[in-house]
């Protein structure tokens, strides 16, 4: 029997209709895996050994009562075959410390999804720089004068922090906007933090597409998140409307170009954000949208993921 651990935010607080981690747990349980539930505070390191207080978990598709704990134990993480790191951002120093603990288990043979080193290496905004032929025009800087020059060149730009999620602190600055200075100061904290600027993509009106990639293979359907009511951001967390769709030719091209790098880096479950035919983000920490896509199309993304995990465990 495969022992699967999951590190996640409190399961009591999730919305099971939309929660991708919950979908993964349902599929793992369907396959007869033993489920071990952990929150960040359950992980610890003693004399170099990664351990955790885990609770054995049962899950069910029931909106009143979707989980129950059926046991608890303290064990070496290396006793688990696979651990899903599904803690939501912020990607802060605490998150990084957790990846070091998980890495100690990985060295003993536990498969960590996604690979701890790659979680540290691949910032969701900055990792796109390795695929700059696929992205919008992009500037990463602390320098207000450079941001101003970029804005003057493109006259309509998006500014965002490198560590936000769910559309937090994303600004659109159009031609003639008097607020560029204060936005630049806010995002860079007066020149002490990097931020990202990209030219505005009018295709956002048709949606910001979340394309999922499982062990290098694109899922054939995506979720387009469409901004509502004059909003620039499509993120569901910012009120966007989700619309599942088949991938377009350009979606396939982007996903296939990036897929081999993701696989090689042990990034087994990744969400690409694509606007029009441009790649804007590579989400590696805790990508979502599984349930919305599976509800609309005949595809089991969690099945693809567990197949990929089982294939890696047999290697």
UniProtKB/Swiss-Prot annotation:
Swiss-Prot/TrEMBL catalytic activity: gamma-L-glutamyl-L-cysteine + glycine + ATP = glutathione + ADP + phosphate + H(+)
Gene name, Swiss-Prot/TrEMBL: gshB
Keywords (A to Z) from UniProt: ATP-binding, Glutathione biosynthesis, Ligase, Magnesium, Manganese, Metal-binding, Nucleotide-binding
One term of GO molecular function: metal ion binding
Amino-acid positions noted as binding Mg(2+) in the UniProt annotation, renumbered to this chain: 281, 283
Pathway recorded for this protein: Sulfur metabolism; glutathione biosynthesis; glutathione from L-cysteine and L-glutamate: step 2/2
Binding, ATP: 151-207
Protein family: Belongs to the prokaryotic GSH synthase family.
UniProt name for this protein: Glutathione synthetase
Cofactor note text: Binds 1 Mg(2+) or Mn(2+) ion per subunit.
Keyword Electron transport annotated: no
Cofactor annotation: Mg(2+); Mn(2+)
Keyword Magnesium: yes
Pfam families, per database record: GSH-S_ATP, GSH-S_N
Cellular component GO terms, alphabetical: cytoplasm
Domain ATP-grasp: 125-310
Entry's EC annotation: 6.3.2.3
InterPro entries for this protein: ATP-grasp, ATP_grasp_subdomain_1, Glut_synth_pro, GSHS_ATP-bd, GSHS_N, PreATP-grasp_dom_sf
């Amino acid at each position: 029997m495969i022992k699967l651990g999951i590190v996640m935010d409190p399961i009591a607080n999730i919305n099971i209709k939309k929660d991708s981690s919950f979908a993964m747990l349902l599929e793992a349980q369907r396959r007869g895996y033993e489920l071990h539930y952990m929150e960040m505070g359950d992980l610890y390191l003693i004399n170099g050994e990664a351990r955790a207080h885990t609770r054995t978990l049962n899950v069910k598709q029931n909106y009143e009562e979707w989980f129950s704990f059926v046991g608890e134990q303290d064990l070496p993480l290396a006793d688990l075959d696979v651990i899903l790191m599904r803690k939501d951002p912020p990607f802060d120093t605490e998150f990084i410390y957790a990846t070091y603990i998980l890495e100690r288990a990985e060295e003993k043979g536990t498969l960590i999804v996604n690979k701890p080193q790659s979680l540290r290496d691949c910032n969701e905004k900055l990792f796109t720089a390795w695929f700059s032929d696929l992205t919008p025009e992009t500037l990463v800087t602390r320098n207000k004068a450079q941001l101003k020059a970029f804005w003057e060149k493109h006259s309509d730009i998006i500014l965002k922090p490198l560590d936000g999620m769910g559309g937090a602190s994303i600004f659109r600055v159009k031609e003639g906007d008097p607020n560029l200075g204060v936005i630049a100061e806010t995002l860079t904290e007066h020149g002490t933090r990097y931020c990202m600027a990209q030219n505005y993509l009018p295709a956002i009106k048709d949606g910001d597409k979340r394309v999922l990639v499982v062990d290098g293979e694109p899922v054939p359907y995506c979720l387009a998140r469409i901004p509502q009511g004059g909003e620039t951001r499509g993120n569901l967390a910012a009120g966007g409307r989700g619309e599942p769709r088949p991938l377009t030719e350009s979606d396939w091209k982007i996903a296939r170009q990036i897929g081999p790098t993701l696989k090689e880096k042990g990034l087994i479950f990744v969400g690409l954000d694509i606007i029009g035919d441009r790649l804007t983000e590579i989400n590696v920490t805790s990508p979502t949208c599984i349930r919305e896509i599976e509800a609309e199309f005949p595809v089991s993304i969690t099945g693809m993921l567990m197949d990929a995990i089982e294939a890696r465990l047999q290697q």
